[in-house]
Amino acid sequence: MNSSGDNAGFEWWRRTMQYKTGIGLTPEEKTRYEDDSKARELKKECLKCYEYRDWMLKYSPTVRFMVQAITKLNKGSDSKFDDSKIICDYCPDWKGGGFHPELGILLCQNRLRDKWHLEDTLSHELIHYFDDLKWQIDWLNLKHHACSEIRASSLSGECRFWEEFKRRGFRTGFHVARGHQDCVRRRAIISVSGNPNCQSKEHAAKIVDEVWDSCFADTRPFDEIYR
């Protein structure tokens, strides 16, 4: 096991220079440096993720509103939201986060581009949290799953015009007037496609379309699409 001194200050600088130049570097030292470098990066990502999480819990209007709505549903307006239910961790899959009814919210520290991406992701998962408490969602029921995905993508801000434009620009198929709805539908289909009870992307699209009108129109706990 490496001492913490090997991974800090001058000693880390020395090891980095040795790794980059290869001078006097044994295969074992090379492997150890790469392992230590990865561990340092993971720790840095984790600390940054929690820093952003805490900032959003304190200052983001959307996140704060959702936390208040969840708290009222959960134990009453006087109870405190348990932020330990929102954890940061490394994710091998290409996703920004996830929600589990028993475990809470996962923020994928290695997939989040910046503070504002984390805000969208956290808002998305908090909407799933709200839905699960309010309607006791059966996440293996495709219609339940699709409805919550539609709401989460629509209300979280991840499909607002500017975010969708940054992703797609003026590519074929991008329509300014219905960009928000196209984004919500696309992301909902992708999420439902990953459900173990979903047979194919076409199956997911069919389910999303079946529940679209009622679920897209349901903006609770907001009065309207806020972001």
From Swiss-Prot:
User: Cellular component GO terms, alphabetically?
Assistant: mitochondrial inner membrane; mitochondrial intermembrane space
Substitution effect: E125Q:
Abolishes proteolytic processing of ATP6, but still promotes assembly of the ATP6 precursor into the ATPase CF(0) particle
> Which Gene Ontology BP terms does the record give?
mitochondrial protein processing; mitochondrial proton-transporting ATP synthase complex assembly
- EC nos: 3.4.24.-
Recorded consequence of changing H124A:
Abolishes proteolytic processing of ATP6, but still promotes assembly of the ATP6 precursor into the ATPase CF(0) particle
Q: Which residues form the active site?
A: E125
Q: How is this protein positioned relative to the membrane?
A: Peripheral membrane protein
Q: Known PANTHER family for this protein?
A: MITOCHONDRIAL INNER MEMBRANE PROTEASE, MITOCHONDRIAL INNER MEMBRANE PROTEASE ATP23 HOMOLOG
Described by its record, this protein's role is as follows: Has a dual role in the assembly of mitochondrial ATPase. Acts as a protease that removes the N-terminal 10 residues of mitochondrial ATPase CF(0) subunit 6 (ATP6) at the intermembrane space side. Also involved in the correct assembly of the membrane-embedded ATPase CF(0) particle, probably mediating association of ATP6 with the subunit 9 ring.
Protein name (Swiss-Prot/TrEMBL):
Mitochondrial inner membrane protease ATP23
Q: What is the lineage of its organism?
A: Eukaryota, Fungi, Dikarya, Ascomycota, Saccharomycotina
The gene it comes from is ATP23
